[in-house]
């Protein structure tokens, strides 16, 4: 059996596959005995989770597993808390039989329960990210020197079209106390691509000013 992994929404492009596209992939992989791991670490940031999450497909396919965590949406990377969703009970039983004991510590277990019950935080965060993401894309899309890609996660991929390199833009932002990602190290992206995360509105405004100089 082969294993194929996919990140949805994707990092660093922030693009996403919808459930129809995922269904085609899973169908093809099943025919070729390929097990698929779908990383949905950023899925909570998506405008409409149901249109891109593969959770609904766990009752139809047994050749894939969804991976999620709390490091991004809940800003808790130190907890090392993640979880999987899978409709293949035999696969889950096999995993449980060989996994290390105590894979989740007591603090992470308690924090995890509190996080997922905090519906106010969840909705407020989703609303803020969606609002600021849309605002930033609208502003940047009006600039001829930038190409903005559709975003489903909490970050936006930008291509610089005026000859400025991603490293030069990175340095410009660092000097202003702002951090962006130079995407030159990502396979398939050259020195013209940057990625930035949605932050506080005032920081977003500072970054927008730098990008539109």
What are these regions (language model features)?
Residues 1-3:
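Short, small-residue-biased leader/transition segments that mark boundaries at the very start
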Residues 12-35, 40-73:
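Active-site pre-lysine segment of PLP-dependent enzymes
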Residues 20, 175-178, 185-213:
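PLP-dependent enzyme catalytic core of the Aspartate aminotransferase-like
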Residues 63-149:
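PLP-dependent aminotransferase class I/II
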Residues 85, 157-159, 197-199:
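Short hydrophobic/aromatic beta-strand micro-patches
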Residues 88, 161-164, 200-203:
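Helix N-cap motif at beta-to-alpha junctions
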Residues 129-130, 143-176:
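Conserved PLP-binding catalytic core of the aspartate aminotransferase-like
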């Amino acid at each position: 059996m082969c294993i194929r992994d996919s990140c949805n929404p994707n990092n660093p492009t922030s693009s996403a596959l919808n459930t129809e596209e995922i269904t085609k992939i899973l169908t093809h992989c099943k025919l070729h005995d390929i097990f698929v791991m779908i990383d949905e670490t950023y899925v909570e940031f998506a405008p409409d989770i149901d249109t891109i999450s593969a959770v609904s497909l766990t009752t139809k396919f047994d050749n894939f597993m969804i991976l999620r965590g709390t490091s991004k949406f809940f800003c808790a990377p130190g907890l090392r808390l993640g979880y999987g969703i899978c409709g293949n009970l035999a696969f889950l039983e096999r995993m449980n039989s060989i996994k290390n004991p105590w894979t989740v510590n007591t603090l992470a277990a308690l924090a995890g329960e509190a996080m997922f019950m905090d519906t106010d935080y969840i909705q407020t965060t989703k609303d803020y990210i969606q609002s600021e993401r849309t605002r930033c894309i609208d502003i940047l899309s009006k600039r001829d020197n930038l190409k903005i890609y559709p975003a489903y996660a909490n970050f936006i991929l930008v291509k610089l079209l005026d000859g400025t390199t991603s490293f030069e833009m990175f340095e410009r932002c660092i000097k202003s106390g702002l951090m962006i990602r130079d995407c030159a190290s990502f396979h398939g992206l050259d020195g013209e691509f940057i990625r930035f995360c949605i932050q506080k509105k005032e920081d977003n405004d500072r970054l927008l000013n730098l990008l539109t100089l």
